[in-house]
């Protein structure tokens, strides 16, 4: 995925898989977005993302960004516990094929949905991933309308989600962006597949547009055929979603606020906390609250994001939920916990 340690772990895993008589297609240093695309586009059974930041770990995914069937996961766990690994003879050993070119094919897929030049849109992508930042610069820098609406997209640490910010909309959570673009797909007559725990505003969008919305839990569900469709990548690929939303705004000549006005409300609440957001304080707050690297917190169907002011002299807490009461309560709880940290 990134480090030399993860590369060594990947090579060791490849040897074990080949010894079991299974072929491996290696895409090299890449993220879950490229891996998911490769599994979808070229009909792979599964994708494995290897990481080794603190300790070695592997993430198993199947087509459409879905989790593998629970029965399969249980079987894998049982084999690992019993150390009952399959091994074949030399003549049946699998082979490793260099499939790194898929990373360039993935970028080309994103370029296909973007116009040569944006009209009325000026996009900036924020991410901690240097590789993602390089791809984003290639996709957006030369296409931006410098006089257009300024929109900042914040990619999640693993690149699967994205939130947005503009002066007129303030922060827009991933869930609302997904619901908005799902509506665009419904207008085009395309079906959409979402995780079963996705907020209900997507169902309301489907009703408004007479769209076909499927829910899935894992790759055993009937929604798999829809989930693996290229247009459904916006559900599990933050960069694809940012590209698709930007393309739609440019094509329609509308602002992000206008595009979101027809999306069913996901109720929001916000609070200000007057605490200096130094690097030490930020680390302490995120650690105590269990935030992601982007300052996001999720509890059931309620989501929140913590953002420092530009001058670092305060924090704004934004929360979104299926009801106004839940959003306000969650926002108030986070605010109280932050204040409690510095008592």
Roles of regions detected by a PLM:
Residues 1-58, 137-171:
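N-terminal small/polar loop signature for handling phosphorylated ligands or for N-terminal nucleophile
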Residues 1-4, 120-130, 190-196:
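Short hydrophobic beta-strand segments
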Residues 6, 10, 14, 133-136, ...:
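Short, highly selective alpha-helical patches that border small-molecule cofactor pockets
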Residues 12, 34-37, 75, 105-113, ...:
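Alpha-helical scaffold segments in soluble metabolic enzymes
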Residues 19-22, 116-122, 185-191, 209:
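Short, surface-exposed connector motifs at secondary-structure boundaries
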Residues 26, 62-82, 171-187, 217:
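Short, acidic/small-residue loops that bind anionic groups at enzyme active sites
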Residues 55-151, 166:
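Gly/Ser/Thr-enriched, mixed-charge loops and adjacent short helices
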Residues 156-160, 165-170, 174-343:
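Phosphate-binding and adjacent anionic-ligand microenvironments
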């Amino acid at each position: 995925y990134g480090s030399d340690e993860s590369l060594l772990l990947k090579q060791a895993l490849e040897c074990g898989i080949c010894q079991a008589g299974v072929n491996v297609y290696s895409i090299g240093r890449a993220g879950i977005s490229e891996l998911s695309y490769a599994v979808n586009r070229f009909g792979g059974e599964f994708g494995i993302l290897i990481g080794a930041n603190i300790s070695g770990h592997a993430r198993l995914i199947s087509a459409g960004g879905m989790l593998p069937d629970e029965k399969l996961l249980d079987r894998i766990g049982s084999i690992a516990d019993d150390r009952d690994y399959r091994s074949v003879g030399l003549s049946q050993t699998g082979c490793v094929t260099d499939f790194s070119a898929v990373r360039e094919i993935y970028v080309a897929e994103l370029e296909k949905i973007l116009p040569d030049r944006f009209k009325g849109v000026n996009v900036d992508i924020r991410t901690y991933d240097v590789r993602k930042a390089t791809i984003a610069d290639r996709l957006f820098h030369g296409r931006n309308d410098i006089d257009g609406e300024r929109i900042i997209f914040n990619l999640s640490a693993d690149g699967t989600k994205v939130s947005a910010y503009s002066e007129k909309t303030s922060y827009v959570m991933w869930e609302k962006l997904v619901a908005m673009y799902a509506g665009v797909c419904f207008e085009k007559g395309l079906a959409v597949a979402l995780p079963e725990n996705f907020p209900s505003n997507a169902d309301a969008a489907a009703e408004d547009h007479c769209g076909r919305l499927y829910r899935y839990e894992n790759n055993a569900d009937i929604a798999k055929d829809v989930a693996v469709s290229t247009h459904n990548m916006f559900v599990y690929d933050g960069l694809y979603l940012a590209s698709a939303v930007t393309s739609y705004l440019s094509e329609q000549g509308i602002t992000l606020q206008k595009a979101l006005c027809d999306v069913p409300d996901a109720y929001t609440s916000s609070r200000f906390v007057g605490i200096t957001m130094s690097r030490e304080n930020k680390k302490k707050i995120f650690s105590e609250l269990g935030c992601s690297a982007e300052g996001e917190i999720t509890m059931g169907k309620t989501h929140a994001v913590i953002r420092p002011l530009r001058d670092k002299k305060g924090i704004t807490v934004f929360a979104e939920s299926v009801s106004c009461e839940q959003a306000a309560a969650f926002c108030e709880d986070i605010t109280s916990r932050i204040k409690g940290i510095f008592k």
